[in-house]
A protein has these predicted regions:
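Hydrophobic/small residue at the entry helix of a nucleotide-binding pocket
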Residues: 136, 140-141
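Glycine-rich phosphate-binding loop and adjoining beta1-alpha1-beta2 segment
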Residues: 160-196
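Acidic, surface-exposed loops and disordered segments
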Residues: 352-700
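E1/E1-like adenylate-forming module used to activate ubiquitin-like modifiers
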Residues: 2-74, 222-331, 362, 366-381
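Short amphipathic alpha-helix with an adjacent loop that forms part of the alpha/beta core around
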Residues: 211-221
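Mid-domain beta-loop-alpha active-site segment that forms a flexible
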Residues: 325-348
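Phosphate-binding loop/pocket of nucleotide- and phosphate-handling active sites
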Residues: 2, 8, 56-115, 343-413, ...
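Conserved S-adenosyl-L-methionine
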Residues: 150-156, 176
Length: 700
């Protein structure tokens, strides 16, 4: 390229921060206007004042029907012998080199707002012209600002945004490519000036900061209404704190689902910020720099995760994977401009006095008739043993052996509690116990373990095996011998095991092979905390593996190389993703397993308490978003969901090793024994001072 041309092409905007037009009124400013035209040979002049005067005449005499001739006569008369060139104002827009001839402010406002009447009366228009509006954030805020300017809902507007207009913004911000690289507040101010050069616009091109906050809110008179549309959590909170202190109402449009939020600090000076949804958080901390992760607890209640649209939720799940930022559509932003602009006008005119959050969801309002949802597969009925069934079972089982003991209730309760402390998939605890005729009966409660992904109850068998192991170990700790009979009656498939307790060992009683693990029953737990991987203590796995081998038909293998652990992490991560996007897997996990609150976990005493899963705030927010099956359906359709691979994969990579328990006979008895071996391995690891995190998605 020619160097001269290259130099010319790299020229910058001579006035990137210019946004106020220059107003010339003749004849007073005639010399200045002549100088301008002489100095700007490329200036473009637009003079259609005669047509504006004709419109003005009609606006001032709405009951009169004018012919073309009579209208022209009336327009000339209105000029009162004044030169047309000296009537009104000449407006120069330096950023576009345009000179436009317009009616002066009062008459301009009459004509420009004439079509507002009487949705907005002239008296109301006069009230609106006294209002000062502040707008923070000029993406959605640009739509709100321009909409308010179109209706002339303010006399002064203060615009705050530090960001510049990028090409990717043009999917929703009404502007031209010639404005790329300009500050968004400047772009909006120029558009307002080109609509109405008489409106007062003040730009804060550093955005709203602690340093300029007083000027933004109070300089030249307090704001009447604040429109908050920024992305910064700290500014959202600081701006509301300032608005509350000054008694200024706050309006916010969230764009998604036509969500509109209003806080009337003018009418409710004691109203909590964000309707009280962030009262539990440290609002002082919000004023300090925060990481993206630290912002999450603040953003969750502000954005309303539960009320996001399915497509927004699905897009959030893809952040950092297939999309780079929160999506926004022009239709949503334009709708938001209308909703917020309408609300600001009605607040300014005292026609609306409420606080709250509202939704104008076009996808719900303008929608096809809903088709009935297919009913979810029914679960087995709740487990119940009637007296007649118990009597019949006792007849089938016959009397207990003569050496069986009649245990005190306290002892039975200790045995049952120990059994109930066994691990189970999803912590569903698929067991029921009955003490009768000197024997403890263990039943499989299918209503608790029902899963379409496990139709033959393989996972439940492993959990029941762990339960059996705990009962045997606890009995040994209490000084009893145990004779256990597994799967004793094919006519009663839910009856999994029968335990008799004796004073002395006899043929068929349980061997005392891992009794030293009994104290670990109550200590065993899942630990999902991350730690730097370290080699296992010398001989630890050999001792753990020996505990597994004491169960016939069971063995264990160890993975401890970083390469193997990384491969396992990838495998389990992919399995987690498949499970999460599968409708059945999703429903069973989010509807049946997850316990979202401490209260729910305490009340149900089962399921997965999220508080124990060591989730970061950002991961917890992701879980809340992912709980919507509509979002997951979209994620699957887009072939996304990579984020689900991060549920277990990072924990595996940060672990020292992984152990796999195997069985030789894959039948129900083999699975029960495998469950016992798994429990032995887990407690043996805890006894070695090792934390354990179960992973099973890749298997099942």
């Amino acid at each position: 390229m020619d160097s001269t041309l290259e130099s010319l092409l790299t020229g910058s905007d001579p006035g990137p921060y210019e946004y106020r037009p220059t107003i010339f009124r003749l004849p007073a400013d005639e010399a200045d206007l002549k100088r301008l035209i002489k100095d700007r040979p490329c200036i473009r002049i637009s003079d259609h004042l005669q047509a504006q005067v004709r419109e003005l005449v009609k606006s001032l005499a709405p009951s009169t029907t004018f012919s073309e001739e009579s209208l022209e006569v009336a327009a000339i008369g209105h000029l009162a012998n004044k030169k047309l060139s000296e009537y009104g104002s000449w407006i120069f827009y330096p950023w576009s080199d345009r000179l436009v001839h317009l009616l002066d402010e009062q008459e301009f406002a009459v004509v420009r707002t004439d079509r507002n009447r009487n949705k907005i009366t002239r008296e109301e228009q006069a009230v609106l012209s006294t209002k000062k509006i502040g707008v923070i954030g000029l993406s959605v805020g640009q739509s709100v600002s321009v909409t308010m300017a179109l209706e002339r809902c303010f006399g002064e507007i203060r615009l705050a945004d530090f960001d510049t207009l990028d090409l990717s913004n043009l999917n929703r911000i009404r502007s031209g490519t010639h404005s790329l690289g300009l500050n968004k507040a400047i772009v909006t101010a120029r558009e307002i000036a080109e609509l109405d050069p008489y409106l007062k616009v003040i730009c804060f091109t550093d955005g709203l900061t602690k340093e300029n906050m007083d000027a933004f809110f109070t300089e030249g008179g307090n704001l009447d209404i604040l429109v908050e549309e920024c992305d910064s959590v700290d500014i959202k909170i600081l701006a509301r704190q300032k608005a509350k202190a000054l008694g200024i109402p706050v309006v916010m449009d969230m764009s998604d689902r036509g969500c509109l939020d209003v806080e009337r600090f003018d009418l409710e000076p004691e109203r909590p910020l964000m309707h009280g949804w962030i009262d539990h958080l440290d609002l002082e901390a919000a004023g300090r720099p925060m990481t993206a992760e630290e912002k999450v607890p603040y953003m969750i209640p502000i954005s309303g995760v539960d009320t996001l649209s399915p497509r927004m939720k699905a897009s959030v799940l893809e952040l950092g994977h297939t999309v780079s930022t929160w999506p926004q559509l022009a239709t949503s932003v334009v709708l938001g401009g209308a909703l917020a602009g309408d609300t600001v006008r009605r607040i300014a005119l005292d026609q609306f006095r409420s606080s709250g959050r509202w939704f104008v969801d076009l996808e719900e309002i303008v929608a096809d008739p809903k088709t009935p949802e297919s009913p979810s597969p029914s679960a087995p009925p709740a487990f119940e043993l009637r007296s007649s069934e118990i009597d019949g079972m006792e007849v089938q089982l016959g009397p207990s052996p003569s050496d069986a003991l009649e245990l005190d209730q306290d002892i039975v309760e200790q045995l049952v509690v120990a059994g109930g402390l066994a691990p189970s998939a999803g912590n569903m605890q698929p067991w029921k116990f009955l003490w009768s005729q000197k024997r403890l009966l263990l039943f499989h409660d299918k209503s608790r373990s029902h899963s379409l992904l496990d139709p033959e109850d393989h996972i439940a068998d492993i959990s029941l095996g762990a339960c059996i192991e705990n009962i045997v170990l606890k009995a040994h700790e209490l000084g009893f011998e145990v004779r256990s009979t597994l799967l004793p009656d094919k006519r009663t498939p839910t009856l999994t095991a029968i335990f008799h307790f004796l004073n002395s060992p006899t043929k068929g009683t349980e061997p005392h092979v891992v009794d030293e693990l009994a104290p670990m029953i109550a200590m065993r737990c899942s630990n999902r905390k991350f730690a730097m991987p370290q080699p296992l203590p010398q001989g630890a796995f050999e001792r753990m593996s020996e505990a597994v081998r004491t169960m016939p038909g069971c063995s264990s293998d160890l993975l401890d190389s970083r390469e193997a652990m990384s491969t396992l992490a990838d495998l389990c991560g992919a399995a987690e993703r498949i499970r999460a996007v599968n409708p059945t897997g999703h429903r069973e996990f989010f509807e049946h397993e997850v316990r979202w609150t401490e209260e729910e976990a305490r009340r149900t005493k089962d399921g997965l308490d999220l508080a124990t899963m060591e989730l970061r705030p950002i991961d917890l927010a992701g879980m809340q978003v992912a709980s919507d099956p509509r979002a997951i359906e979209l994620t699957d359709r887009w072939r996304g969901g990579k984020g689900f691979e991060g549920i277990s994969a990072p924990a595996i990579r940060m672990s020292s090793a992984a152990a796999l328990v195997s069985i030789t006979d894959y039948n129900r008895l083999g699975r029960l024994n495998g469950g016992r071996a798994m429990e032995r391995l887990w407690m043996a690891a805890n006894a070695e001072g090792l934390s354990v995190h179960p992973i099973s998605a890749a298997i099942f």
